[in-house]
């Protein structure tokens, strides 16, 4: 059985540990019965341990109840960069191993419900733990938006990034983030009202900047290059520029130039939102990797209705902990 799950960018500035958007960059996991445990990794993360400590192996063994498995991982998602690689891997491994509740398994094994929700449900999501279960709502997303991701050659673990945060926050800063998150949700639903201030944050980004000192300057360059808003991607060190589709290539070039000027090795990716989430193939179909055309159009207009207006992704869909609508 094969399963594929998308990368994701969590937090999106003010939505700390709550918001995430799925990106069209993928992890595929294939699980088969075998006489002993075999783990193979191709692509990003290929240098990681190919033994029972591998996250895909731990998830698959937990779900299948046996270690007599052959597990193959093919990943496009950079590891330790704030792009939800472990959540995507956990979701795909859980589904390929036969989990009935891949969202619950991924959230438990990865520890990040926001990334896990985006990997399973796709699109823009808000996630929360409620009485020990993951509750998810898929929010409306303007599909004309694209994302420029600065991915530095710097690995930053979520645990280390979290240690940089204060144990307490002021009421003023909590209210600041709540107001910005409201603006952000509205702006992501309709890019015409997306303000650059919508990704402002007082809970985590500034505290993490010492771990990647070039971040503030690069974020400014993303905005100056044409991004509607910019923020850290997850716990970093990757940085996210939210753009109109027509501006994506221009912002990507600005990101590359800013990285070169700041002497930050790495790459700048131009990605669309993934609107499908987790996909499972039990039949070995040749078209499992569907047409890789992005869900956003080259002219930045998104899909259009008969009247010529942009069609947003439908929001307001609630999911329980097992990922079922």
Predicted regions and their residues:
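Glycine-rich, charge-dense phosphate/pyrophosphate-binding loop(s)
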Residues: 187-306, 313-325
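Alpha/beta catalytic cores of group-transfer enzymes, especially the acyltransferase/condensing modules
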Residues: 101-146, 210, 216, 230-232, ...
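ATP-binding N-lobe of GHMP and related small-molecule kinases
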Residues: 1-81, 99, 275-282, 287-292, ...
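Active-site rim beta-loop-alpha module in soluble metabolic enzymes
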Residues: 148-210
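Short beta-strand-to-loop capping motifs
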Residues: 33, 129, 152, 241-245
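Phosphate-handling active-site elements
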Residues: 34-36, 65-70, 96-108, 131-135, ...
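DPxDG-like acidic metal-binding loop motif
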Residues: 23-25, 83-102, 120-125, 130
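Solvent-exposed alpha-helices and their adjacent loops that cap or buttress functional pockets
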Residues: 9-12, 20-23, 82, 109-111, ...
């Amino acid at each position: 059985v094969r399963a594929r799950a998308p990368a994701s960018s969590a937090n999106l500035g003010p939505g700390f540990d709550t918001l995430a958007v799925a990106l069209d960059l993928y992890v595929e996991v294939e699980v088969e019965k075998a006489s002993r445990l075999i783990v193979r990794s191709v692509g990003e993360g290929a240098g990681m341990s190919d033994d029972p400590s591998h996250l895909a192996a731990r998830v698959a063994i937990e779900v299948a109840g046996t270690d007599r498995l052959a597990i193959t991982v093919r990943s496009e998602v950079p590891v330790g960069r704030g792009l939800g690689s472990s959540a995507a891997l956990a979701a795909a491994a859980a589904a390929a191993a036969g989990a009935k509740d891949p969202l619950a398994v991924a959230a438990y094994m990865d520890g990040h419900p926001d990334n896990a929700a985006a990997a399973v449900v796709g699109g823009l999501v808000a996630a929360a733990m409620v009485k020990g279960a993951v509750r998810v709502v898929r929010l409306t997303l303007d599909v004309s938006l694209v994302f420029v991701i600065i991915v530095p050659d710097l690995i930053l673990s979520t645990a280390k990034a979290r240690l940089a945060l204060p144990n307490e926050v002021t009421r003023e800063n909590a209210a600041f983030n709540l107001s910005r998150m409201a603006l952000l949700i509205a702006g992501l639903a309709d890019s015409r009202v997306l303000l650059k201030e919508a990704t402002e944050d007082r809970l985590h980004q500034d505290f993490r900047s010492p771990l990647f000192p070039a971040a503030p300057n690069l974020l400014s360059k993303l905005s100056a290059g044409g991004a509607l808003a910019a923020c850290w991607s997850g716990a970093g060190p990757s940085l996210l520029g939210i753009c109109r589709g027509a501006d994506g290539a221009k912002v990507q070039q600005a990101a590359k130039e800013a990285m070169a000027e700041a002497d930050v090795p790495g790459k700048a990716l131009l990605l669309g939102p993934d609107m499908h989430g987790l996909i499972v193939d039990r039949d070995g179909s040749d078209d499992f990797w569907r047409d890789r055309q992005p869900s956003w159009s080259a002219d930045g207009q998104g899909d259009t209705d008969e009247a010529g207006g942009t069609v947003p992704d439908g929001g307001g869909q609630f999911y329980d902990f097992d990922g079922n609508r």
